[in-house]
Regions:
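Non-transmembrane, membrane-adjacent beta-strand/coil modules in membrane-associated proteins
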Residues: 84-125
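Transmembrane-cytosolic junction motif
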Residues: 11, 36-68
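N-terminal low-complexity, intrinsically disordered "leader/linker" segments enriched in small/polar
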Residues: 2-5, 55-59, 104
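Juxtamembrane interface helix immediately N-terminal to a transmembrane segment
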Residues: 1-17
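A membrane-cytosol interface segment of integral membrane proteins
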Residues: 111-147
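Cytosolic juxtamembrane segments of membrane proteins
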Residues: 54-99
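Hydrophobic, membrane-inserted alpha-helices
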Residues: 16-26, 41-44
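Transmembrane helix interruption/hinge and helix-loop junction motifs
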Residues: 26-35
């Protein structure tokens, strides 16, 4: 299953950009150059600062987490994404390596998309396609990532 993700604004992104713009407008009275610089930075942040993701055809805003780990985690992760109930400690796996796990998730909706890559010839190549996880399996993966 090929799922494309596009960057979108989150409410937090808009609030931060608005605060920087307002700080620029407010400081324009004291120092016009500083005010213009801050307001310009706020406008640029509004254009380019996007921390949320949306899957094609879905409305939920997702958060992205990427983790590099050793090759010994490849098969257990494939098994977990395939539906087997496996307990993994990904906290000690995050030391880097040739396997990359990218997870796009929305904890409130109990929805996650996982992509698993292997590193070879200086590029990441998909080890498995994008896998959509729901409810308990998504919740378990999100809790493993936060350990």
């Amino acid at each position: 299953m090929e799922t494309n993700f596009k960057s979108v604004h989150t409410p937090k992104d808009i609030i931060i950009s608005t605060i920087v713009i307002l700080a620029g407008v407010g400081s324009y009275v004291l120092n016009p150059a500083l005010g213009v610089t801050l307001a310009s930075c706020g406008l640029l942040m509004l254009c380019f600062f996007k921390k949320g993701y949306k899957a094609d055809g879905k409305e939920q805003v997702l958060t992205k987490v990427a983790m590099d780990m050793s090759a010994s985690y490849l098969q257990p992760l494939k098994d977990f994404l395939g539906g087997k109930s496996i307990d993994l400690n990904l906290g000690e796996a995050s030391k880097g390596g040739p396997v990359r796990l990218e997870v796009y998730f929305n904890q409130a909706a109990e929805l996650a998309y996982a992509q698993l890559y292997t590193f070879s010839n200086y590029t990441y190549e998909p080890a498995v396609g994008t896998i959509e996880l729901h409810s308990k399996q998504a919740e378990k993966l999100i809790s493993m990532l936060k350990k």
